[in-house]
UniProtKB/Swiss-Prot annotation:
This is Large ribosomal subunit protein eL14. InterPro entries: Rib_uL2_dom2, Ribosomal_eL14, Ribosomal_eL14_arc, Ribosomal_eL14_KOW, Translation_prot_SH3-like_sf. One of its GO terms (cellular component) is cytosolic large ribosomal subunit. The gene is rpl14e. Keywords: Ribonucleoprotein, Ribosomal protein. PANTHER family: 60S RIBOSOMAL PROTEIN L14 (PTHR11127), LARGE RIBOSOMAL SUBUNIT PROTEIN EL14 (PTHR11127:SF2). GO terms for molecular function: RNA binding; structural constituent of ribosome.
């Protein structure tokens, strides 16, 4: 799995109410936060600032400029053929707790 988070990278939200939904990084705020968008009309993720610990990067990337609008992101996703991929939800990996783990 790719561990690079850069503008245009497709990511999966792993925490919060949008867990399992895919989004695209449109801006990097600092070393801890990025701005992502679904766009909401496509994957259900609205444009927002998120902690990088709450997302998991994928190996997919689209060509967009920093701060691209939702319309520009949607056009880039269509050009890359990733529209159906973005609509699919991913089941977040949950920790498996065994009886030996409980003390």
């Amino acid at each position: 799995m790719v561990k690079v988070i850069d503008v245009g990278r497709v990511v999966v939200k792993v925490l919060g109410r949008e867990a399992g939904r895919k989004a695209v990084v449109v801006d990097i705020v600092d070393e801890n936060y990025v701005v992502i968008t679904g766009p909401k009309s496509l994957s259900g993720v609205r444009r927002r600032r998120v902690n990088i610990n709450h997302i998991e990067p994928t190996d997919k990337k689209i060509e967009i400029k920093k701060g691209a609008s939702d319309e520009e992101v949607l056009k880039a996703l269509e050009a890359a053929g990733l529209v159906e991929y973005m609509k699919e939800r991913v089941k977040p990996k949950l920790f498996e707790i065994t009886p030996a783990d409980v003390k």
